[in-house]
Amino acid sequence: MASFLHNFLLFFCSLSLIILTSSATKSQTHVPIRPNKLVLKVQKDRATNLHVVQIHKRTPLVQFPFVIDLTGRFLSVNCENQYTSSTYKAPVCHSSQCARANSHTCRTCSSSKTRPGCHTNACGLLTTNPVTQQSAQGELAEDVLKIPSTQGSSPGPMVTYPHFLFACAPSNILQKGLPKNVQGVAGLGHSPISLPYQLASHFGFPPKFAVCLTSSPGKNGAVFFGEGPYFMKPGIDVSRQLTYAPFTIGQQGEYYINVQSFKINNAMLPSIPKGGFGGAMISTTTPYTTLQTPIFRALNQLFMNQLRGVPHVKPVAPFGACFDANRIPTSKMGPTVPSIDLVLDNKKNIMWRIFGANAMIQPRPGVMCLAFVDGGMRPKAPIVIGTQQLEDNLLQFDLMNSRLGFSSSLLFRRTNCANFNFGTSSTNTDP
């Protein structure tokens, strides 16, 4: 009898321990993940030189490519191309979601059958193709979005934003000039429903994001949301040793930095307007830095004066200063040419240095050109800093303090923007 009682007690204790352990394990697997940093992989499209980010949306979950746009105010999605999701909703006009999106327009869909992007009494948003600047009214919508978390060195578990706000855009404006098969535009601009603001607000981390665009098609650059560190192989925190400068916001949510002048080999650009050139817009949808005609001509002349001993050749459009590529040696920083400094604050010696890899382009064999183009007499901004000059540089946007942190070329630190360890992110998600 004593032996039976002893065995029964052992069995009961073992069973209780198994139940408690199972319950604890189950509880742990359902603890909501509150990440302090998120990451998306971004690739350079060979045909357009635009950069495309992969985003998971809908129910059931599907991954889609979107062009990243630093001037975009929200995520614009082609909802006319078989958009199927059980969690799609169109907030009604004058709702709190519409107020958050600064939408004060009620739209009516002419179709008798409702579908994603076509609801009556929904909120209207003006959607724009960032390449062609073609615009059309779209529908404010919300749906599930999932995104990989990270501690800074590799992707972690996917986390969920169940009611992410975006715009359903007409398919005809999301085609011309954009990479094949993209499903819309990922807006990173200064707006309440842009990706950076929504993600920071939902997950509770500081409103900061960083862009690291790769120069190599087929490889992955990264867009980080949240504070650093951001590690690139071999274990380099590229968020350290940044130079900082204030930025201002344009009417459409664009980011501008003040450029006082250009400097090449310590030679300052002549004929500088009082106070400098003013706002230089940073753009991920402009392939090469675009300059107002007088600035373009002056910079080309100064660069040709400083690049001595290299024969000039006939310019290849759209570039203005081209050279015999066989006479330009290369190094880890790209073509060995004089570096170009964007002088942001001459008194404080704050400069953004552009080395050969970002300054030069080889449009055809044997020819190398200065990768700056003429924007005409009345461009959107006197200077638009394009992706050729942004690639393999880390740019961190601190939205709370209106401050830009920039690394200059990561090649100088023996790494680049394709060196984030994406590996394979976990499929585990939070609620």
From Swiss-Prot:
Keywords: Allergen, Disulfide bond, IgE-binding protein, Secreted, Signal
GO MF annotation, one: aspartic-type endopeptidase activity
Any GO CC annotation of this UniProt entry: extracellular region
Superkingdom field: Eukaryota
GO BP, sorted A to Z: proteolysis
Gene3D superfamilies: Acid Proteases
Leader sequence residues: 1-24
Disulfide bonds: C79-C168, C93-C106, C98-C123, C109-C118, C322-C369
Residue ranges of every copy of the Peptidase A1 domain listed in the record: 51-407
Site (Cleavage): S271, I272, P273, K274, G275, G276
Key word Cytoplasm present: no
Broad class of where this protein is predominantly found: secreted
Residue ranges of the TM segments: none
PANTHER family xrefs: ASPARTYL PROTEASE-RELATED, BASIC 7S GLOBULIN
Function statement: Sulfur-rich seed storage protein that remains undegraded at germination.
Subunit-level organization: Two-subunit monomeric unit made of alpha and beta subunits coupled by disulfide bonds (at pH 4.5 and under non-reducing conditions). Monomeric alpha and beta subunits in reducing conditions. Can also form oligomers including dimer, tetramer and cyclic hexamer (trimer of dimers) (at pH > 5.5). Component of globulins complexes which accumulate in seeds. Interacts with flavonoids (e.g. apigenin glucosides) present in globulins complexes.
Identification of the protein by name: Gamma conglutin 1
